[in-house]
Amino acid sequence: MAPLFTGFRFGFGRGAAAETGGAVNATGGTKTTYGSRTIHTFTTVGDATFTLENGNLPAVQIMVVAGGGSGGSRHGGAGGGGGMTYVAEPNGAINAGTYKVRVGAGGTATYAGTHATKGDWSFFGPTGTADWPTHVMAEGGGSGGCYSSNGGWSAGANGGGASGESSYPNPQQAPNSPAPTAFGTSVSKSGADGGGGDKWGTCPDCRLGGGGGGQAGNGGPANPGPATGGAGFQYQIAGDPNNNYYYGGGGGGGAWGQSGGVANGGHNPFSAGAAGIGGGGGGGSSQISPGGGKFGNGGASARNSGLDGSQGANSSGGDGGANTGGGGGGNGQSNYVSWPGPTNKGGAGGPGIVVIAYPTP
């Protein structure tokens, strides 16, 4: 469940003073308008500033989405969707000053047998050290498990899926995110769990990775598979029907196998998991056509859809969509006779986004 904040009083007293006289003016990010509201959208990974001069902004709406985790490769679990924090309070306000904005990167795509990485934090707040309760913050998504790692490799706002060749095929459990209680009554829940993997001998011989957790749903387990990613959470900016997307979808779990099956010296064919809506990347399948399972589709209904996984000896998990916080897709393995292959990777996590909207002064 994504965070819902009520009774929020947004008055950051620690922003650097910027009043110089004249009309109220805010700068930073890409500045657009919709109806009677002004919107600042920050999409570039890294640090930026939001500066407000000559007064305060009432009825502020803020959305912060962190980077998604990357998917594992070689029996890979999928990356979890990035965390999301939003603030929508008619009585909230931002005081004049300069504030720091950070857009978190998605987890890095890694090769077969190399541990996937967690997504980075995103935040908005004063220019000092970012922390609760002075900042609005969202934690990056957890990374997916790979061969020999237990569960998802790094915990995050939403859990990464477990590996399909793990001694502990249970999913990560999503931690609770702290809430900015200094600003008023708040309700916060960070997200969802990654799906469990299905290791050798239990399917039999599936070795499927679990789906990544999304902001609005758990990642699917590998058994019964395919391991789909959890759904992201839908959030509308400034009442704009064209700015109403899902964010933080989990990636789809990877699959391993060969079309010949165990009787012919290969591995049973199974399909990789589709990603959750909200920009997750689809799972990759190392199975060879014809007769094998297929790759998983990327998650749509997002600012930028997640990419599909790919299939075959050079398979990879799909990347999470740009500025969605979608988790990367897990990948199966390169050709089962010779691994790891030079191009087999889990999907990268999608970068996050920060959006600020308010009534046009």
Each model region followed by its residue ranges:
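Low-complexity, glycine/proline-biased repetitive segments and flexible coils/loops
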Residues: 2-361
